[in-house]
C-alpha cells in the first residue's frame, strides 16, 4: 500500500493556499506550490458548509484515496492542497480521480 506524505501544520496549508497557484472545477479546488524537497506532500480540507461531519470525512477520504491511487502521476517537489467545494458524498472514487487528473493537466506542472 502506497502511503502519502501529508501536510500536518497549519502554516504549511496557509503557505500553499496564500503563495501557491490554484485550479478548480465544480467539486474540487487544487492549490499547489513548489516545496524544494524533491517529494510531494498532500493536504486535504473540507468546508464546514458541508454540515455533517460524516459527509466531510467521506469527502476527505475520497480525496485522499484518489491521490494515493494516482501518486505516480503527480510531479515531484510540490505541495498540494485539495479542498472540497461542495458535498461530494454522491460521487464515486473514480469520478474524484478523473476530476483530480483533469486539474493536474490544467495546472500545467512539468513532471520531473
From Swiss-Prot:
GO annotation, cellular component aspect: ribonuclease P complex
Enzyme class of the recorded protein, top EC level: hydrolase
Coiled-coil regions, chain positions: none
Keywords: Endonuclease, Hydrolase, Nuclease, RNA-binding, tRNA processing
A Pfam family recorded for this sequence: Ribonuclease_P
Catalysed reaction, written as an equation: Endonucleolytic cleavage of RNA, removing 5'-extranucleotides from tRNA precursor
E.C. designation(s): 3.1.26.5
Highest taxon of the lineage: Bacteria
Molecular function terms, GO-annotated: 3'-tRNA processing endoribonuclease activity; ribonuclease P activity; tRNA binding
tRNA processing keyword on record: yes
GO biological process, one term: tRNA 5'-leader removal
Stored InterPro entries: Ribosomal_Su5_D2-typ_SF, Ribsml_uS5_D2-typ_fold_subgr, RNase_P, RNase_P_CS
Similarity-based family: Belongs to the RnpA family.
Assembly behavior: Consists of a catalytic RNA component (M1 or rnpB) and a protein subunit.
Functional summary from the UniProt entry: RNaseP catalyzes the removal of the 5'-leader sequence from pre-tRNA to produce the mature 5'-terminus. It can also cleave other RNA substrates such as 4.5S RNA. The protein component plays an auxiliary but essential role in vivo by binding to the 5'-leader sequence and broadening the substrate specificity of the ribozyme.
Protein name: Ribonuclease P protein component
Amino acid at each position: 500500500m502506497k502511503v502519502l506524505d501529508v501536510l500536518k501544520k497549519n502554516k504549511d496549508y496557509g503557505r500553499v493556499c496564500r503563495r501557491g497557484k490554484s485550479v478548480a472545477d465544480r467539486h474540487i479546488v487544487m492549490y499547489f506550490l513548489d516545496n524544494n524537497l524533491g517529494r510531494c506532500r498532500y493536504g486535504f480540507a473540507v468546508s464546514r458548509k458541508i454540515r455533517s461531519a460524516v459527509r466531510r470525512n467521506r469527502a476527505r477520504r475520497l480525496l485522499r484515496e484518489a491521490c494515493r491511487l494516482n501518486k505516480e502521476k503527480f510531479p515531484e517537489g510540490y505541495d498540494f492542497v485539495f479542498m472540497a467545494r461542495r458535498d461530494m458524498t454522491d460521487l464515486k472514487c473514480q469520478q474524484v480521480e478523473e476530476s483530480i487528473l483533469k486539474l493536474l493537466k490544467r495546472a500545467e506542472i512539468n513532471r520531473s
